[in-house]
Amino acid sequence: MNFTETLQSLTGKPLSVCTNQELYLALLELVRRKSADRVQPVTGRKLYYISAEFLIGKLLSNNLINLGLYDEARDALAAAGKSLADIEEVEPEPSLGNGGLGRLAACFLDSLATLNLPGDGVGLRYHFGLFRQSFENGVQNEKPDPWLTAHSWAEKTDITYPVELAGKEYTARLYKLAVTGYEGRTNTLNLFDLDTIDESIVHDGIAFDKTAIDKNLTLFLYPDDSDEAGRRLRVYQQYLMVSAGAQLILAECAARGCNYHDLADYAAIQINDTHPSMVIPELIRLLGEKGIDFDEAVEIVTKTCAYTNHTILAEALEKWPRSYLDAVVPQLMPIIEKLDTLARTRTEDEGLAIIDKDDRVHMAHMDIHFTHSTNGVAALHTEILKNSELHGFYELYPEKFNNKTNGITFRRWLLECDPALTAELEQHIGSGFRKDAAELEKLLAFAEDETVLNELTAVKKANKQALADWLLHTQNVTVNTDAVFDIQSKRLHEYKRQQLNLLYLIHQYHEIKAGHLPAVPLVSIFGAKAAPAYTIAKDIIHALLTLSKVIAADPEVSKWLQVVFIENYNVTAAEKLIPACDLSEQISLASKEASGTGNMKFMLNGALTLGTMDGANVEICQQVGEENIYIFGQTSDQVIHRYAAGDYCAAQWYEGDANIRRAIDFLTGPEMLAAGHAENLTRLHDELIHKDWFQTLPDFNAYVVRKGQALNDYACDPLGWRKKCLVNIAKAGFFSSDRTIGEYDRDIWHLGQ
């Protein structure tokens, strides 16, 4: 049967009379069958990538591309008068992640399958994700983000595992979601849930009874931890994930002939950040039940497990009060105590203990002591870990530390989300970059070719128009496509410094009012969610929404400046924003961003980076050269020194600089107060003057100058700008997750061996 006949056999009627929902379900079933054909037997070592998040995005187009069916599906549907793009709108986006951590995990699964490596994900089947963001009266509101339907990519299985929480046994059910590689194998994302979850207990936004564990355990990713019940619920979640996951791993390995003593020959377990850390004592406990003594179990688990550190922020290195673990996982505490005792025989440094003097259990410490590898996710990040944040551990275990710079899957972030650029590239350098991202370097041969540069300009212009159409349709916002599209889309956090961008926009507002007109209009686009209990982050959102209203109401300013905040930013929105971006905002405080991957996605799609020397920005700069990126601000060494000296006083910068003072005071000026809420604006105003922990003010003037240079280059040297864009695309190959996964496999996992 041809494609049309196959699809009609699934719908039971001609495609032309099918609804988009019927066609979506038929395509889902077709993809499932084709994916199943690519499942391969596992020999040797298999990876289990355990992560609290998998931000996989919509899957229909991605799977059709990876299976080589996209063009066929699009054409068959078009012949029946149907649009694949319209059918994609029917698909709900899975609410299984939030930020870069979860998106990285999703890219890694894609690359594992594409490289024909045996590697499955292990996580939780959240019903409502983080939350669905809406803006009401200028503030962020949170609601459930439902995505589970009767027909989902994640298929229910009959496989269950008992999990003991607070002395009570729960039954974890396994759901399997097929992960299809590009011209590669099919792996699996294993997601655990409870049959007893009750979605109806959620009320008043995202409030629910945090003590009703049987009903609430997998409702939300990262339950609000502003109270003790929420913090304990996170421990419950983490143990459900690792206990069910560990039982799955042991069962699968045993089915392949493992006798448990040789577990490390059958499994490689990657602990993605500290959320899955309890897999270490849980595996030791389960191996003990198989008759393996403690010392051997520790040796087996250490050889099997590896840990990825994703943060330099101390607040994000999880430390649970012992009382929580005593209450929720009492079966693990004797094991954790023995691990702490064993760790103390290796070092006298109290700072490296697992259980500290305040009776807190340090998850990252347990990970480093009892895995065989600890990696950072960008060269700078790993050096900071070794020389600063985890220096004591590096001195104790230098052989464990290594770097694996993050990457992104080009299948989603180029082939799927930017088909126009993909076609343009294939016209000039062939299609080899689809599997070998390094082939993008061939584009450098066209760096002086005005015809090619003009074609790239046309692609970007079309993508900007497509984004403008989408913004009008989904956000009811009209934007000027002749303006520079300046985009900062990432989790809302003070260290990522959306507040620096905010102060710049206020500065520009004043400059325009004073008659100092910019070289080109600017549309500044934000996409970000703030954690529900993160007050200042929500205040930053409010300030940006309020500023947007103030500017829109001022015709003198609005023709030069516009602020747009995307509601409910997710992967689908990112796929619209990234191809249309001119200037990519990567402005975290140097030394604070472990890597970042948004910077890579924007670069790949021909945006230029405005950024600090932080995270993977450093390596982007090395790849493209300083002339093809806009770097500003303090270095990581300068920032670390300033923290060590303890002498940063934001008030001195505020008092000593008229531009800074004007920008901050505008937050509580009459224009903003008339459009916004005094409580939110005053709190942010005071925070910037009296705290500013992430050093916004010392970098402010350098940011204003560098951004001005970028906008002038765009306006005054369009061909030079486009050449810089071409170089960025050509040098993006290093940031493929295929390269990253190849390095993990070579140095840590040794899969299939």
Functional labels for PLM-detected ranges:
Residues 1-753:
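A conserved ligand/cofactor-binding region detector
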